């Protein structure tokens, strides 16, 4: 968890952060890497997250984290800024994400296959009022579905659906 694990967020002379060094080492041994982070309203995203993205295969963030990392406003008081989503995903790719960049929100999941340029949007499920009992762990559940799809070598579109399904299972 970037921005949460103090030791891994510390600077590293060669890699930028200790987390980036861990990810680089994993990739050196042909392991696929993924990052998660916590949402914060600070300005540590460039210093802590950017170095890690150079060694990241799969990046799955929410709209708050996506805005913090990219500097592109992905939401406002009225909701998601749809017109900025692809730009946000492209910025994650530019920062180093190698395979999939994904941004999820209550309304939609958006994904960019960084290898092919494929952009996908998958709307959230329409559920009856009161169906969702809580949102604690929602982002973690979504991420687990995405990573399962990656492990199964599914498409990025299917990965977004897997993420939504995992989220649904933990929210009731």
Tell where the protein language model's regions lie, with residue ranges.
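Conserved post-catalytic alpha-helical subdomain immediately downstream of the catalytic base
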Residues: 97-100, 125-172
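Ribokinase/PfkB-type carbohydrate-kinase core domain
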Residues: 1-120, 125, 154, 160, ...
């Amino acid at each position: 968890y970037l921005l949460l694990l103090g030791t891994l967020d510390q600077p590293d002379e060669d890699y930028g952060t200790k987390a980036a060094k861990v990810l680089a080492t994993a990739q050196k041994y042909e392991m696929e890497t993924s990052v998660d982070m916590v949402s914060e309203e600070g300005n540590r995203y460039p210093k802590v997250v950017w170095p890690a993205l150079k060694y990241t295969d799969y990046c799955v963030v929410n709209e708050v984290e996506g805005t913090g990392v990219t500097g592109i406003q992905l939401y406002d008081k009225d909701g998601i800024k749809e017109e900025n989503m692809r730009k946000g995903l492209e910025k994650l790719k530019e920062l180093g994400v190698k395979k999939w960049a994904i941004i999820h929100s209550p309304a939609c999941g958006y994904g960019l296959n960084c290898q092919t340029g494929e952009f996908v949007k998958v709307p959230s499920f329409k559920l009856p009022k009161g169906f969702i009992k809580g949102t604690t762990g929602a982002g973690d559940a979504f991420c687990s579905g995405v990573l399962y799809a990656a492990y199964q070598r599914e498409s990025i579109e299917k990965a977004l659906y897997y993420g939504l399904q995992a989220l649904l299972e933990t929210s009731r």
